[in-house]
A protein has these predicted regions:
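Metallocofactor- and cofactor-centric catalytic cores in central/energy metabolism, strongly enriched
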Residues: 1-173
Length: 173
């Protein structure tokens, strides 16, 4: 299944409209942006969460400032890289480089976007089998959907498989 249905047509529209306007003016004009609209929702077979090894994937732009480079949050064209963060990391060691959402809630309670404590509680209660060693974060502001499909998604899949994940929890920002 294609990540973006009609991939080439989407790239052509993106390049000729939103990106061309941005390159000419330096302005992000969102009424020119054609969001991908798939007709088929991806799915797979159901999993038993009590037996699953779950990876959490967050678009919060989380990173470890003491050891990882921040995302390029000011780049109008986005940052398509990922960061792996150990699940046991203290919340005060995590920072957020993402300027495209209101940080009020996450500043008050990190678990609204990084619910690792709640997930560990569910593992302890036997509701989830286990968690991967690391969770995955990326900066959700990524206007080039083709680049997401060609770079970000494969990197997330590779990192998830390397940790033996059998299921994923997606946490949008």
């Amino acid at each position: 299944m294609d990540i973006i249905e009609n991939h080439d047509a989407w790239v052509e529209t993106y390049t000729q409209n939103w990106l061309a306007h941005y390159n000419e003016t330096g302005e992000t004009k969102w009424d020119l942006y054609n969001r991908p609209n798939n007709k088929t929702a991806p799915s797979g077979k159901a999993i038993d969460l009590k037996q699953a090894k779950l990876v959490m994937i967050s678009s919060a732009g989380a990173y470890l400032p003491d050891s990882q480079e921040a995302y390029d949050a000011e780049n109008d064209l986005g940052d398509y890289t990922i960061r792996l963060i150990p699940n046991g990391t203290a919340y005060d060691k995590i920072a957020y480089a993402h300027t495209h959402y209101d940080h009020t809630a996450v500043n008050m309670d990190t678990q609204v976007l990084i619910p690792t404590g709640h997930l560990r509680d569910l593992v302890e209660a036997g509701e989830i089998g286990s968690l991967t060693d690391d969770f995955i974060s990326f900066m959700g502001y990524q206007p080039n959907a083709a680049q997401v499909a060609e770079e970000t998604v494969p990197a997330i899949i590779e990192a998830s498989k390397a940790q033996g994940a059998t299921g994923a929890l997606l946490v949008p920002s």
